[in-house]
Each structure stands twice: as C-alpha cells, then as structure tokens.
Amino acid sequence: MGDIMLSTVLVANRGEIACRIIRACSEAGLTSIAIYAENDAGSLFTELATVAVPLKGDSIGETYLNQQQILAIAAQYSVDAIHPGFGFLSERADFAQAVIDAGINWIGPSPHAIEMMGDKMTARMTMKAAGVPVIPGEEIESDDELSLIHI
C-alpha cells in the first residue's frame, strides 16, 4: 500500500472529538474543514478549524447525518479525506462507502468492518474466530423477545 498524501480533511462531527481531530490536523500541517449546525455556530471546534462551513437544516438528521450535504461540501472544498470522529456517521457503512466512491479518503474502519462490528452477533463470532477472548453468553438471535425469556 502506498503512502497517501493529504492536505485537507473534512471533520464530519462536532464538539470535543472534532476539536481533537482538528488539533491533530493542525499539528500535521493539514487544512481542517469543520461543518456545523446553526446551534453550534461559534463553538470551539468551529473556531479551531481552518474553515468552518454551516450546514443547512434544523435537526441532527438534516445536518450532521445528512450524507449528501456533507459530500457536497467535501466536493466544494476539494477535501482529500473525511474523518467521521465517533458516533454520527462513523457507524454508517453506506457513508464510508459513499466517501470512498466519491474518490475521497475515508479515515476510519472499512465499510465491511463497520458492517461486521455493527451487528453484535456478527461481532462476537468474528472476534471469537480471531481468537479474541469474548465474555461468555448465549449466541442466539431472535426477533421474538418472549422466546428468549426461557433461555
């Protein structure tokens, strides 16, 4: 795998995690693009970023979870990578894949890893197969909660 040269990173998160990512970008000499909802205007992460771009919308779904809007901002600013932080879009395999499909570097686990670890049963089986100690417990999946009472 070759080295990837980055110059601009879009931080697709807010608050303390965004501050940490932006500081790391700054220390590495990278331009950081923060995105923010109206109620986060003036927050520390928007002040620390090289550029802060407002998101349109009133709810989390319309702002920090709006994949199309975030990808459009990434394209507008010609970012080299997107860092999702944790929570929000970091747990969305479809977003990770959309970033990669757009030709932008994804800073995070692969879409496949996100899918595998997002499902607790698959995660347990994957970890056990890899030899990672797992707390003992039943490995039964059921949509019928009443049937699980008798286990």
Positions of predicted regions on the chain:
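N-terminal beta-alpha lobe that positions the nucleotide/phosphoryl donor
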Residues: 2-149
